[in-house]
Amino acid sequence: MLGFQQRLLLEEQEKFIDYRFNKALVRRLTLLEGAELEKFMQLFRPSYLFTKLSGDYEFRLYIKQSLYRYKRGLPPLVWEEENLLDQ
């Protein structure tokens, strides 16, 4: 069972991801709507670390590359968190 402080931290991290990876931005970049938009956002939700460390260009590029994979039925890429820290 997670401690109260850990739960609060996880909640804040999820809110930060929601703030950057929001429906308005994803809809604008992908032109997806409705259930398809929801499915895409669930499948390709970025990690907290990637969301925190990436700039706007990298973040939008991630969404576009994810759309390419989504439309071809490919799974999301697995990001190696250690590589993000080395940059």
Predicted regions and their residues:
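Short beta-strand and adjacent turn/loop elements
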Residues: 1-87
